[in-house]
């Protein structure tokens, strides 16, 4: 029986799913480090059981009833608010629940195990990335780019079906579609969000167009062609800064240990990543997920990073990014209740990861932490700062593609999504679609299927990262090697966990509400 007393209600519900949630996280980890029918089956079984428990309508009714009372304990009230959001996200009919878990598990398994063929042999994502970064053979580049999209055709049907099931669930709860429901459950006002997206589109359009025009000029010379297509760029989705001939750190970082650099970076901020790195799985192999993520298994110190590190700039940046997530997770006040021992919001932890990842293009970090020569970095410092701005511009325009596409996907899963994808790519990224291309390239991005309504958090994270950097510069004199900056982030951002809403946390941490001003100012200053 569900208690109607708020304290006992919270304790009882937490007790019902805490251990199962931890067990599910362990099974999820196992399914990603080695995708087998057994590991996938175990993960799906636990996810279904967890969703059933959280889908209890009586539990939701009890929590909503408790929130109607005049609760004077902020911690208790916040726990009830967090419970409500989690329970509401799982209210669905049993056939919907079973189909949702079946489809999402199958798609994740496909992404973890699928390897396309190129020139008669199986290749990994890392090998495709290397071709697009370095090859001067247009035919090989085209074949590699097309191979990177093959997984999209494999999963597209199931991704559409996932959108239909999610929409059915959302409409049963009174929402127009799953996209709007998800924003509500993320405590994210839709009108405010798209006002920000529109403003960022306008503010970045001219500088991005100017930067890309210069890049395209050099690429046309490099490939001896007047018409550029997606495979001429250095990333399957044109979301990573290309080594454009002026600055690349691949050679300089060829022989460094990414994990050691992360340990040194966060150690200078007073954060010990030793236990995280010891528990992590960092190098590529067959049947392992080819992407990267950080997983907080138990909200009690068991935090792990999955990566596929190979030498060079990209994976050092990825490891810094994921280590930012890990530093946040292990620094949350352990005395907080289990329900509140998580980041204040998805985009707040993304902001910390982005701050960390940006260090790869910080001349001070490259010399003081990575140990590169001052004269070596000094000679390319201006280019490094320009590359930092280019990365922010490129990534902002890429996120705009994903944000608008996802909203359209859930508005109408039956639409011509293949065409809509390329409309957005051409508008936001100024990349020309291949002639006659008619393939579900949108489904080749793993987030579309398994991390729905997530991508806007990256751009909000960019904004908050810049705002926090400005705060650290103002109050601590900077970030690199500054223990005071680590203390500021730990005390104001990490330790509170999810004790308050993201808007309140940002006001308290930076002294102002979330704004794109520092982000736009930073990229325009670096680009000039």
Per-region residue spans from a language model:
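Post-HExxH zinc-binding segment in Zn-dependent metallohydrolases
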Residues: 197-206, 343-379
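N-terminal helix-rich structural modules
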Residues: 1-154, 453
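Active-site recognition of the HExxH zinc-binding catalytic motif
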Residues: 311-330, 350-354
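C-terminal, non-catalytic "cap/extension" segments appended to globular domains
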Residues: 1-6, 37-40, 81-82, 177-180, ...
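Beta-rich nucleic-acid/ligand-interaction surfaces
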Residues: 281-290, 340-350
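Active-site-proximal, well-structured secondary-structure segments within enzyme catalytic domains
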Residues: 119-130, 134, 146, 160-306, ...
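Extended, well-ordered alpha-helical scaffold/bundle regions in very large, multi-domain proteins
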Residues: 39-50, 55-59, 183, 187, ...
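Glycine- and acidic
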Residues: 144-151, 183, 190, 241-251, ...
